[in-house]
Amino acid sequence: MQIPKYENKPFKPPRRVGSNKYTQLKPTATAVTTAPISKAKVTVNLKRSISAGPTLNLAKKPNNLSSNENTRYFTIMYRKPTTKKHKTWSGDGYATLKASSDKLCFYNEAGKFLGSSMLPSDSDSLFETLFKAGSNEVQLDYELKENAEIRSAKEALSQNMGNPNPPTTSTTETVPSTKNDGGKYQMPLSQLFSLNTVKRFKSVTKQTNEHMTTVPKTSQNSKAKKYYPVFDVNKIDNPIVMNKNAAAEVDVIVDPLLGKFLRPHQREGVKFMYDCLMGLARPTIENPDIDCTTKSLVLENDSDISGCLLADDMGLGKTLMSITLIWTLIRQTPFASKVSCSQSGIPLTGLCKKILVVCPVTLIGNWKREFGKWLNLSRIGVLTLSSRNSPDMDKMAVRNFLKVQRTYQVLIIGYEKLLSVSEELEKNKHLIDMLVCDEGHRLKNGASKILNTLKSLDIRRKLLLTGTPIQNDLNEFFTIIDFINPGILGSFASFKRRFIIPITRARDTANRYNEELLEKGEERSKEMIEITKRFILRRTNAILEKYLPPKTDIILFCKPYSQQILAFKDILQGARLDFGQLTFSSSLGLITLLKKVCNSPGLVGSDPYYKSHIKDTQSQDSYSRSLNSGKLRVLMTLLEGIRKGTKEKVVVVSNYTQTLDIIENLMNMAGMSHCRLDGSIPAKQRDSIVTSFNRNPAIFGFLLSAKSGGVGLNLVGASRLILFDNDWNPSVDLQAMSRIHRDGQKKPCFIYRLVTTGCIDEKILQRQLMKNSLSQKFLGDSEMRNKESSNDDLFNKEDLKDLFSVHTDTKSNTHDLICSCDGLGEEIEYPETNQQQNTVELRKRSTTTWTSALDLQKKMNEAATNDDAKKSQYIRQCLVHYKHIDPARQDELFDEVITDSFTDLKDSITFAFVKPGEICLREQ
């Protein structure tokens, strides 16, 4: 036996599948005929001794590759069936559909036939249907329309025509006799012996300039690429198209799934926020009444801006606008070449991959529900940390959120929890693309650990949501603005020198007649407004009037009981006040005590200030036995009237849990079913309490702590709200009152504010009516502010003294300040005053000439009169459209509940301001 000689040759690589297919096929002699070889045909029966691969079969496979113009072509995505929660596609391909057929044929990218499936009965769901093709799941992605696209698809599919799948390689191949064995296939003899080399598939993306996938810029064959937006603007009714800069490659269009629900002010808000986060300069809009949201403007870049402050009033839909922006940035980007794209040139990922939402713990559930309501949680992954988690579990969840790309896109976390996971966030801060802070005014303290933690994350794109970001402190204003857009106002030292000092001096009552200081303060105020309006958006809830049911506002002045008057006198005498050294801070405890007396004298004994400064055992015992008050009597009469006269529910709001305790006891005694929410209720129980109240018709009342009611609670199950006492901060009361008059409310709303006549309650109300001036000034509410005046600090020590005075001989001290009408229910029209001109004249006279002591005293008296007139003017502006009603002269209060209860309340209500809703006016 001859043994082959061993030769040390290099390893010969295996033959590539598909090349030289038939070089091993050797026909027998009987296969040769006298006919020309090019025309001869043989019948070959291939047998495989080892391979289990498919036999050669040239029977025509289903395809729709004819040149018929009625054939439609689609791009597809396919995958193997899987039970994974988060499924991905394994490949792309094509589908064809003939006009004369109702069957789709599917092919992979190499032109290999995958299978076919019948069309769905609903043609509208063609692109939503998951087809079954062989062992694959297939979904249509995009229909090819352009001629170049169709040619590319035909060319790709035609590569596999006539070239059946090559047989798998076997160790032995035999070719038996050429007799026709069942007609398995026939081929020309010339093809049998020719060396057929399968052409390498040429990618579709290299055959056309349209709908190309992205390739590296270093590619030798790179050509001009064209990209397309995720949504076709021509197929969307009233689309929202974002603005862009000159470098943008595609338009960013808000998903119509959300866009169709947005109101005009919300459309503008989403576009404004997008511009800020993208660093675009504000566009110049000649006519603000024209809707510009359907057009994309090419704007300049503004390198100072990368964040936004949305300071809209409560109820304008800040959460929905934020979700719309988040969804837009997750799904879309104007820079398509920087992300992976589909075969059609459509970006597959957005500008942001991971977004951090930080909010009060009570709002975490509300945020997640809103995501589910508007988007469905199957579209977007939202992670919240369970309150039952251990710290280690929270840290692990945060790590997984940041490192696992496809599962979750949004993390919602409470401000307090943020501190416990700050280390994990810090390690992976480069993965966080956007930060959203709800109730952003909580970040106004520059020394806050939460604020410093958020600063350390160094997230470029930031969105802050708040109803009232500034009241009267420019230091806090700087802290918030510098966090949103660091450095835009310079350092704090320069900001203080340029803005705080001149503006504060201009607002100081001691400089009210210094023309130079006032002009400089006004100039600096305008300069700051120009800087901040580029990224601050503020709208009032007056926008909602045409969308929500009418609202009637009623301010009721309640006569104090004699026991309350005695309590006021005893406390003020026992306090031994030194008005020369008195400041607001030093008198805060006394102010709180007097507010409690307005609610009920029974609250006096447990007050810390009373125990430490005044304590009188005999008086304390008499107060504890006197739980009733003028406001409590009016409250219980109103509740009884609402329960008997209507089928509506009511919310009762107070700033003190002790007051809620008294009200709760009175409601229990009256048999009024109710639920309660205050600071002692765990966060995880609050959602269920609110849901139960809104849905259960058997629950009549809802007792709410004002501090708990200012964080997004939706109590639309009630249509009447009673604000039992007032807070110094008007935003607290406004937020609490907005709990019922918001989206989802179907009934006309009635808001009652109870004020004790002639006492500190009225002073707080007057303060509220004027305190918004600074907030309005820097946030753009120009309708109510006096543009020519920068003297916003209208309370001095004389005002502080007046806080502790009790007016027992008035029906309403507030009405006495602004009006002298008879209270017959008429809406008072106030003429324009020349108060500003008088003030300017006083300034000039006091600063330009020498003044004697007598003249100085005269000018000081004039100044005091001028200040009183100015206070009256500010209060009057806030009470425009209110009707003035004296119950002794007029018993119609534009509310059937109070009108019907007037017989019982005539001695308890001394005066009323009523701003009726539209329905009330029509009924009159």
Swiss-Prot record:
One of its GO terms (cellular component) is nucleus. Residues 631-790 form the Helicase C-terminal domain. GO terms for molecular function: ATP binding; ATP hydrolysis activity; DNA binding; DNA topoisomerase activity; DNA translocase activity; helicase activity. InterPro entries: Helicase_ATP-bd, Helicase_C-like, P-loop_NTPase, SNF2-like_sf, SNF2/RAD54-like_C, SNF2_N, SNF2_RAD54_helicase_repair. There is a cross-link at K615 (Glycyl lysine isopeptide (Lys-Gly) (interchain with G-Cter in ubiquitin)). Its EC number is 5.99.1.-, 3.6.4.12. Residues 299-487 form the Helicase ATP-binding domain. Residues 1-10 have a biased composition (Basic and acidic residues). Residues 1-21, 155-183 are annotated as: Disordered. Keywords: ATP-binding, DNA damage, DNA recombination, DNA repair, DNA-binding, Helicase, Hydrolase, Isomerase, Isopeptide bond, Meiosis, Nucleotide-binding, Nucleus, Topoisomerase, Ubl conjugation. Residues 168-178 have a biased composition (Low complexity). GO terms for biological process: double-strand break repair via homologous recombination; reciprocal meiotic recombination. ATP binds at I346, P347, L348, T349, G350, L351, C352, K353. It catalyses: ATP + H2O = ADP + phosphate + H(+). It is found in: Nucleus. It comes from the Eukaryota. Belongs to the SNF2/RAD54 helicase family. Involved in the recombinational repair of double-strand breaks (DSB) in DNA during mitosis and meiosis. Has DNA dependent ATPase activity. Promotes D-loop (displacement loop) formation with RAD51 recombinase. Modifies the topology of double-stranded DNA during the D-loop reaction to facilitate the invasion of the homologous duplex molecule by the initiating single-stranded DNA substrate. Required for adaptation from G2/M checkpoint arrest induced by a double strand break, by participating in monitoring the extent of single-stranded DNA produced by resection of DNA ends. Interacts with RAD51 and DMC1. This is DNA repair and recombination protein RDH54. The gene is RDH54.
